[in-house]
Amino acid sequence: MAIISSKKQSPQPERPDDDIFLASENQVSYKYKTKKSKSQAQRSEVEALLEPEASAAEKSDNQNEEKIRPQRLDEYIGQKDLKEVLNIAISAAKSRKESLDHLLLYGPPGLGKTTMSLILAAEMEVNCKITTAPAIEKPRDIVGLLVGLQKGDILFIDEIHRLSKMTEEILYPAMEDFRLDITVGQGKSSKTRSIPLKPFTLVGATTKVGSLTSPLRDRFGIIQRLRFYEVDELSLIIIRAAKVLNTDITEDGAEEVARRSRGTPRIANRLLRRVRDYSEVKKLTPINAEIAGEALELFNVDPLGLDWTDRNLLRTMIENYNGGPAGLETMAAATGEDAQTIEEVYEPYLMQIGFMQRTPRGRVVTAAGWRHLGFSPPDEQLSLKL
């Protein structure tokens, strides 16, 4: 659910024993009760949230994952424009001895938003706490995170568009003025005061930047989009990962995996592991283009990176709706897939490669999409601009 990286964490500051009511800029109050543990050595509820126990297998997987992740900005492959912007921001913050400005990263999943937050922490030599918006269920969850941050620390919140309104309102003064607005007590005897926070950097990640409220979005000083990767960039990522995994792969083998990776490093690393398994079991080394192609065909990944679900989505639209237009909910009902999954996972890549288009009346399969599945497109699909 969350990771703490880099430096050793200092103990969280003591909180008052009183019932605390958190007040936003609009003076909306939320109750926050502190709970005393049986002993000071016992983890708090927030610490348990941030540092879950991992099994030996999970620890091994995490170690491999950490080795594959680039550790520094100059090791990060691709996203040239983003790296230039962040390099300037890092240099400026270091020269002024300030924390980085708040950063919002948006784009399809798997493009390296979490990795970039860890790199920023490494470059700034600070801690990085990672969590997701759905894990922040109550005001005390975000309060625990904020008060535990040391000077310059980075707080990474994935799926930030899913934050509740009350959590957002707590973040407003925290992001802008590095303070928590709280009200102690209830009724006429209540008193409002501000608790200072140490300067920190909030890094938010989202696949739906349009779903963020304007007050939250406007508090980010840097807003950057992550794009899909080119084949040559993914090839370099795959070759680097193969070295970490002690897997012998040729340049054309890496390129074959890259072509089928949907422009996404996370998928590239996953497919590399499947190809490695195939190579080891079949005793076929080094992994060249032919071996990689055979392995990925076995796992139902075609030369353009489409899997069974992608092809089923296109085929259903062609066979049932003559290629569209069809609404998102109609597509979900016809294929049995979740509408949000179609919109966030499958549709962006199908649109990226020109197999699907959005129109005012719904989604439409393009002529290229028809041909990829072996169908002859009707005249109306031929007229669509690709």
From Swiss-Prot:
It is found in: Cytoplasm. DNA binds at residues 358, 363. Residues 303-386 are annotated as: Head domain (RuvB-H). InterPro entries: AAA+_ATPase, AAA_lid_4, DNA_helicase_Holl-junc_RuvB, P-loop_NTPase, RuvB-like_N, RuvB_C, WH-like_DNA-bd_sf, WH_DNA-bd_sf. ATP binds at residues 68-69, 110, 113-115, 176-178, 219, 229, 266. Its EC number is 3.6.4.-. Residues 1-12 have a biased composition (Polar residues). One of its GO terms (biological process) is DNA repair. One of its GO terms (cellular component) is Holliday junction resolvase complex. GO terms for molecular function: ATP binding; ATP hydrolysis activity; four-way junction DNA binding; four-way junction helicase activity. Gene3D superfamilies: 1.10.8.60, P-loop containing nucleotide triphosphate hydrolases, Winged helix-like DNA-binding domain superfamily/Winged helix DNA-binding domain. SUPFAM superfamilies: P-loop containing nucleoside triphosphate hydrolases, Winged helix' DNA-binding domain. Residues 230-300 are annotated as: Small ATPAse domain (RuvB-S). Residues 56-70 have a biased composition (Basic and acidic residues). It is an enzyme of class 3 (hydrolase). Keywords: ATP-binding, Cytoplasm, DNA damage, DNA recombination, DNA repair, DNA-binding, Hydrolase, Nucleotide-binding. Homohexamer. Forms an RuvA(8)-RuvB(12)-Holliday junction (HJ) complex. HJ DNA is sandwiched between 2 RuvA tetramers; dsDNA enters through RuvA and exits via RuvB. An RuvB hexamer assembles on each DNA strand where it exits the tetramer. Each RuvB hexamer is contacted by two RuvA subunits (via domain III) on 2 adjacent RuvB subunits; this complex drives branch migration. In the full resolvosome a probable DNA-RuvA(4)-RuvB(12)-RuvC(2) complex forms which resolves the HJ. Belongs to the RuvB family. The RuvA-RuvB-RuvC complex processes Holliday junction (HJ) DNA during genetic recombination and DNA repair, while the RuvA-RuvB complex plays an important role in the rescue of blocked DNA replication forks via replication fork reversal (RFR). RuvA specifically binds to HJ cruciform DNA, conferring on it an open structure. The RuvB hexamer acts as an ATP-dependent pump, pulling dsDNA into and through the RuvAB complex. RuvB forms 2 homohexamers on either side of HJ DNA bound by 1 or 2 RuvA tetramers; 4 subunits per hexamer contact DNA at a time. This is Holliday junction branch migration complex subunit RuvB. It comes from Trichodesmium erythraeum (strain IMS101). The gene is ruvB.
